């Protein structure tokens, strides 16, 4: 079995905080890292100046390893990678594009490379190219998603990847999920939605409240007709957007125009009616706003209890 992500990154617990555009900043990342996980700063929609400033800020807030998430569909991705190489966070996660061309530059800077993969083919490709670990993300996740479920990925990717940790993502929000992934041979889990209701999370209070009120069936997937599916909470915007997609009367260009800026509208400005509240399916665990340290302690306690109970199972 491959190493755990705790060994690769030098962290206490096998939990990575997902990169969430307009949300995952230095404050949240540092809080997660200080609590024993691996925090991530998101570059989604951000300038190079912002990325540099947040990395430096995180270094002042924690002496523990943290990372940066780069969406490879961003127009300024090359400049952002250059900044990351200069500022040297512990690791980088790379998604929404081909990560392999960036491996050499990042590794030469001493930065661990962790691509996000949606299928077995890409998982094998990035492993062969020298990834230090990978995140296999199922469609239960919030934000941009693939077409395979987390269980389908877990049972097919993990047996193929022998030498590096496979961190599972998509629908994980508690210790039972973490325990299940570890029993399946995962090197850890990545959670994004779970940290949206953390005290240290900068997402607008209106969105936090909607997440706490949400039930398990309250997500919807937009963008299926555009080749870029995005999961979020059902509201006026997301339901009307999907309706327009299904009717087939609205052009692709118009749909893209409608969607542009809606993530920021919800997460930063707090418009939970007309904005896209990106979140995954692990919603019922979002009961209240509490510190990151409490969230992680509760996850680990439940994971240990679940693993202990699993030891008594007879087949």
Label every model-predicted segment.
Residues 1-161, 165:
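Active-site entrance/lid segments in N-terminal catalytic domains of soluble metabolic enzymes
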Residues 21-22, 37-48, 135-147, 172-207:
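Glycine-rich phosphate-binding active-site loops on the catalytic face of alpha/beta enzymes
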Residues 116, 170-171:
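Conserved acidic functional residues
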Residues 152-167, 173-315:
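Conserved active-site-proximal phosphate/metal-binding subdomains
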């Amino acid at each position: 079995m491959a190493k755990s992500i705790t060994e690769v990154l030098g962290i206490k617990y096998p939990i990575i905080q997902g990169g969430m555009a307009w949300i995952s900043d230095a404050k949240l990342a540092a809080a997660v890292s200080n609590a024993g996980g691996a925090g991530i700063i998101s570059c989604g929609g951000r300038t190079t100046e912002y990325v540099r400033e947040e990395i430096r800020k995180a270094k002042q807030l924690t002496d523990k390893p943290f990372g940066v998430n780069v969406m490879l569909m961003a127009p300024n991705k090359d400049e952002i990678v250059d900044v990351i190489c200069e500022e040297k966070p512990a690791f980088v996660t790379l998604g929404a594009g081909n990560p392999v061309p960036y491996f050499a530059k990042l590794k030469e800077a001493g930065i661990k490379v962790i691509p996000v993969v949606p299928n077995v083919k890409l998982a094998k490709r990035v492993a062969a190219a020298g990834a230090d670990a990978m995140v296999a993300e199922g469609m239960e996740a919030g934000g941009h998603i693939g077409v395979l479920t987390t269980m389908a990925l877990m049972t097919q990717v993990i047996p193929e990847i022998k030498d590096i940790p496979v961190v599972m993502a998509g629908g994980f929000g508690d210790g039972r999920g973490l325990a299940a992934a570890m029993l399946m041979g995962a090197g850890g889990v990545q959670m994004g939605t779970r940290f949206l209701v953390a005290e240290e999370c900068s997402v607008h209070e209106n969105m936090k409240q909607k997440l706490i009120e949400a039930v398990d069936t309250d997500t919807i997937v937009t963008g299926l007709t555009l080749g870029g599916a995005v999961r979020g909470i059902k509201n006026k915007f997301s339901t009307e957007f999907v309706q327009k997609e299904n009717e087939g009367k609205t052009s692709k260009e118009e749909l893209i125009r409608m969607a542009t800026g809606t993530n920021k509208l919800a997460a930063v400005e707090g418009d939970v009616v007309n904005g896209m509240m990106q979140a995954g399916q692990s919603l019922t665990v979002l009961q209240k706003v509490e510190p990151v340290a409490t969230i992680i302690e509760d996850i680990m306690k439940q994971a240990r209890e679940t693993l202990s109970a699993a030891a008594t199972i007879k087949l």
